Swiss-Prot record:
It comes from the Bacteria. This is UPF0102 protein ELI_05985. PANTHER family: UPF0102 PROTEIN YRAN. GO terms for molecular function: nucleic acid binding. It comes from Erythrobacter litoralis (strain HTCC2594). SUPFAM superfamilies: Restriction endonuclease-like (SSF52980).
Length: 116
């Protein structure tokens, strides 16, 4: 039961993050993309930049400080690397972003969160 609630919360967070990105001028190219190396929550594009976005939803703002770490980011980066050629065309850049969400607070968008 807890897993189902967490899954639903995660999907709701991804939906909210997609809405927020669209409001900021991004197009959502894909959601929940599975790769052999992991899953990408959102793939977004604005201009010649593609962002592979990890979305984290927590019950409180305080919990957001510990929602993402280097290990999780490295998994997202590996997954993004596996599919980057499907979304970023010649001459386009890509990066790994994180969007942190909690009830009652604005989304916190960490652009270019992973730099190996």
């Amino acid at each position: 039961m807890k897993r189902q609630i967490a899954e639903r919360s995660g999907r709701d967070g991804e939906r909210r993050a997609a809405l927020w990105l669209r409001a900021k001028g991004w197009s959502i190219l894909a959601q929940r993309v599975k790769t052999p190396r992991g899953e990408i929550d959102l793939v977004a594009k604005r201009g010649k930049l593609v962002a592979f976005v990890e979305v984290k939803w927590r019950k409180t703002r305080a919990e957001l400080d510990h929602a993402i770490d280097e290990y999780r980011l490295s998994r997202v980066a590996a997954a993004a690397e596996a599919i980057a050629h499907d979304y970023a065309q010649d001459g386009e850049d890509y990066r790994i972003d994180v969007i942190l969400l909690a009830p009652g607070s604005f989304p916190r968008h960490i652009a270019n969160a992973w730099q190996p």
